[in-house]
């Protein structure tokens, strides 16, 4: 339920804005560094502007506005945040979860004799969707309930709510059509019960974080939710149904995901137009919105989200093709922005530490990247310090594990990490030693590999249970070539630099390795990660290496289930590295214990397990962290009150912004 209800951690895959970090460390507090600005003189007071902002975003919209239930692209998630903001608990400017008094009247936790815990939640009366329909407890129960049905499995929901909620597992499997752990108490009160195994949770208060969805909008006319005393169930025209895929409900749901108009939601803005062909989305103020957790309502009437192109973004800003360009990370682009400001453009630059890092991600279920020695070797064949200096030009720093420099855990562990993490510094000899130790000692004929003159290295995988695509048969043996398939996204400067400094570098060739680059679009990247085509059909694993970025949308650090070997959860998108480290002290064990074996508030115990987890991760290296960075956002000087930081993105910051000169 934690991941479904609160979406505590979002894997943010950034395309061309996947870049680098700052040489300065962030704040020692969990809250992010406050954005700093460089401004040109204000525009003339007589200048009039339309009450509209055009936002340029480098991440392509896919049209999945489900808040991460299907996919979790950065731009799609941003749109969802703009149109859905009635969670009972939400993140504040520091990335910490807080109660949302606009929505939440009261809540309580009851610890039950069987070890489970029940959260009783009462919402305020008078809340409505953007179409004026009232919001009740049923709407909150429905969203939680939906992820516990066979329907969620059929559509490959990323939610694991069925694992956390009492009775969710048997409903998910289709044994029953109700969830005993989701109850409707009265019109504005519901309860959610968490199973004993997960009731003990370091971030336990977030179990009270639920949000509303309109039943008929998502499933179709006549659908609803009811509770006769045993738990909630889905209804159609008043009759109980077992909600499965492959029917009108699925058709309606898929159409609703990116509805071009009539998108029923409950946030500061409403979608008024979405054009998938141009990846452009227009939103206008929702007049029914009651305000965020601080009661703040937006004043800027219209937001238009457009695709920012790497080659033309500066011209787009100059000519009015876009007003705000968020998340600039390329060192050249940052310097271009600062030069534009110095030259008198009506812009201000907001800088803030990134809560995330750019990376190479390995898929450890196919090809050579299944083997840890290969992952180590790739890391040592890339000069990351030079990469960061070249790409970031002083705005980035190298990190050695999954953390951001602004995190409290990192700040409290600097000495420990320096003493215990391997940096995988550029070292061709060390890389070759790793490969030899890992058994990559043969040629394509089975002879001993001695140098690059022999071509690619090969490994005897005859007796190993591995994915053997691309292998050759020699004298009854199965030999795997040291050829890594790499998928990268188009118009991506990070990919361009990796091609030069890694894939096409002489050091790689001299080591008997080949990295084959395939360039494609965002949907192709998602297919490569989740082993699914655009229609959700499973496809064979093909790529062993990708480049993207990871970001945290809150100060919560929870990787539980990210290393699971449960095939149902893997099918939902968990463990997207396909690395199954299941023994005691492994990634799965440590990530689970970090949050489920620690009492809320026991930071020292949490930190100890966090450090163990980071060390184990660094040993197995499922990814190569490239950089932690400072983001820059370009904002017009005629926009006031726009403040952005690590955990406070455009969707949140725009609520506090205004255009005093708006007509």
Question: Predicted regions: what is each one?
Answer:
Residues 105-160, 185, 191-193, 316, ...:
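Aromatic- and charge-enriched surface segment that lines or borders ligand/interaction sites
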Residues 153-157, 163-164, 272-287, 304-366, ...:
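Extracellular/periplasmic solute-recognition and catalytic clefts
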Residues 282-284, 371-506:
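Append "and occasionally in soluble cytosolic enzymes with long acidic Gly/Pro-rich linkers
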Residues 56-114:
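N-terminal lobe/hinge region of extracytoplasmic solute-binding protein
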Residues 92-93, 206-298, 302, 312, ...:
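Gly/Pro-rich hinge or "lid" segments in bacterial periplasmic/extracellular proteins
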Residues 157-245:
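Surface-exposed binding/hinge segments that line
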Residues 381-416, 497-505, 533-663:
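Detector for C-terminal structural segments
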Residues 199, 203-205, 389-392, 440-490, ...:
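Bilobed periplasmic-binding protein-like "clamshell/Venus-flytrap" ligand-binding domains
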């Amino acid at each position: 339920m934690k991941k479904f209800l609160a979406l505590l951690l979002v894997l943010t895959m950034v395309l061309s804005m996947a870049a680098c970090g700052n040489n300065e460390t962030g704040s020692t507090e969990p809250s992010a560094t406050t954005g700093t600005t460089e401004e040109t003189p204000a525009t003339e007071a007589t200048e009039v502007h339309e009450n509209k902002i055009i936002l340029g975003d480098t991440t392509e919209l896919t049209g999945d506005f489900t808040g991460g239930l299907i996919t979790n692209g950065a731009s799609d998630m941003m749109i969802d945040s703009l149109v859905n903001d009635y969670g009972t608990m939400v993140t504040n400017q520091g990335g910490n979860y807080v109660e949302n008094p606009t929505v939440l009247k009261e809540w309580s936790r009851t610890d039950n004799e069987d070890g489970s815990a029940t959260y009783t939640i009462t919402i305020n009366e008078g809340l409505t969707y953007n179409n004026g329909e009232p919001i009740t407890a049923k709407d909150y129960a429905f969203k939680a309930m939906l992820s516990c049905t066979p329907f969620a499995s059929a559509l490959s929901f990323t939610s694991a709510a069925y694992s956390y909620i009492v009775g969710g597992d048997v409903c998910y499997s289709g044994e029953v059509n109700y969830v005993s752990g989701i109850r409707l108490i009265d019109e504005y009160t519901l309860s959610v019960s968490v199973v004993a195994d997960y009731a003990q949770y370091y971030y336990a208060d977030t179990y009270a974080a639920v949000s509303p969805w309109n039943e008929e909008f998502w499933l179709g006319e006549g659908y609803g939710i009811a509770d006769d005393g045993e738990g909630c169930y889905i209804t159609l025209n008043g009759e109980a149904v077992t909600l499965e895929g492959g029917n009108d409900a699925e058709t309606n749901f898929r159409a609703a995901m990116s509805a071009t108009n009539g998108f029923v939601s409950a946030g500061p803005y409403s979608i008024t137009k979405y054009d998938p062909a141009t990846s452009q989305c227009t939103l206008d103020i929702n007049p029914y919105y009651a305000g965020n957790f601080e009661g703040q309502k937006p004043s800027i009437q219209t937001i238009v989200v457009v695709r920012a192109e790497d080659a033309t973004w500066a011209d787009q800003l100059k000519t009015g093709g876009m007003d705000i360009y968020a998340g600039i990370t390329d060192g050249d682009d940052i310097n271009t922005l600062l030069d534009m400001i110095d030259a008198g453009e009506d812009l201000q630059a907001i800088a803030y530490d990134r809560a995330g890092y750019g990376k190479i991600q390995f898929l450890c279920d196919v090809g050579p990247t299944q083997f840890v020695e290969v992952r180590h070797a790739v890391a040592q064949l890339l000069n990351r310090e030079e990469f960061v200096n070249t790409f970031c030009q002083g705005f980035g720093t190298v990190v050695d594990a999954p953390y951001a420099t602004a995190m409290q855990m990192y700040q409290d562990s600097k000495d420990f990490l320096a003493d215990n993490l391997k940096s995988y510094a550029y070292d061709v000899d060390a890389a070759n030693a790793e490969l030899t130790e890992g058994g990559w000692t043969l040629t394509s004929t089975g002879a001993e590999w001695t140098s690059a003159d022999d071509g690619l290295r090969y490994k005897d995988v005859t007796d190993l249970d591995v994915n053997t695509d691309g292998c050759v048969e020699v004298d009854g043996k199965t030999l795997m070539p040291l050829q890594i398939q790499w998928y990268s996204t188009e118009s991506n400067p990070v990919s361009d630099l990796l091609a030069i400094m890694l894939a096409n570098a002489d050091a790689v060739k001299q080591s008997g390795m080949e990295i084959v680059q395939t360039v494609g679009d965002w949907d192709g990247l998602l297919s490569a990660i989740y082993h699914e085509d655009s229609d959700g059909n499973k496809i064979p694993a093909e790529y062993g290496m990708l480049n993207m970025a990871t970001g945290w949308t809150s100060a919560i650090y929870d990787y539980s289930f990210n290393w699971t070997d449960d095939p149902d959860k893997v099918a939902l998108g968990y463990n997207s590295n396909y690395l199954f480290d299941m023994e005691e002290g492994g990634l799965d064990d440590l990530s689970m214990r970090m949050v489920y074996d620690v009492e809320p508030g026991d930071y020292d115990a949490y930190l100890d397990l966090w450090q163990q987890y980071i060390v184990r991760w660094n040993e197995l290296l499922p990814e190569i962290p490239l950089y932690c960075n400072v983001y820059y956002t370009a904002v017009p000087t005629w926009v006031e009150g726009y403040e952005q930081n690590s955990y406070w993105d455009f969707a949140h910051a725009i609520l506090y912004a205004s255009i005093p000169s708006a007509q």
